[in-house]
Swiss-Prot record:
Family that this chain belongs to: To ferredoxins from P.putida and C.tartarivorum, ferredoxin I from A.vinelandii, ferredoxin II from D.desulfuricans.
One biological process term in Gene Ontology: nitrogen fixation
Protein name: Ferredoxin-like protein
InterPro entries: 4Fe4S_Fe-S-bd, 4Fe4S_Fe_S_CS, ETF-QO/FixX_C, Fd_FixX
GO molecular function, one term: iron ion binding
Cross-referenced PANTHER family: FERREDOXIN-LIKE, FERREDOXIN-LIKE PROTEIN YDIT
4Fe-4S ferredoxin-type domain mapped to chain residues: 57-87
UniProt entry keywords in alphabetical sequence: Electron transport, Iron, Iron-sulfur, Metal-binding, Nitrogen fixation, Plasmid, Transport
Alphabetized SUPFAM superfamilies for the sequence: 4Fe-4S ferredoxins
Primary role: Could be a 3Fe-4S cluster-containing protein.
Length: 98
């Protein structure tokens, strides 16, 4: 009989390495008075938890742990809430297992 092993996403993410390009984030959130529904959704659906709602009700991004999966582009590209570009060569996520 095999024993099921529960794996957490946090354990997998911990294996990745990130080379941060200090002062040049590849993701920025457009200034807003109140966040759109898509920006609010990013606080829940970003797999790396890069988006947070701050104390003033604004959505902020911390791009340091970004997996470059494109979830934010899919949700916010149409309305322009997020500006996303690829990190410069050699920077960004370095996947441990491919």
């Amino acid at each position: 009989m095999k024993t099921a092993i529960a794996e957490r996403i946090e354990d997998k993410l911990y294996q990745n390495r990130y080379l941060v390009d200090a002062g040049r984030p590849h993701i920025t959130v457009r200034p807003h008075r109140s966040p759109s529904l898509n920006l609010l959704a990013l606080t829940r659906v970003c797999p790396a938890k890069c988006y947070e709602l701050n104390e003033t009700g604004q959505v902020e991004v911390t791009a340091d742990g970004c997996m470059e999966c494109g979830t934010c582009r899919v949700l916010c590209e149409a309305n322009g809430d997020v500006e996303w570009s690829y990190p410069r060569g050699g920077f960004g996520v370095l996947f441990k297992f491919g």
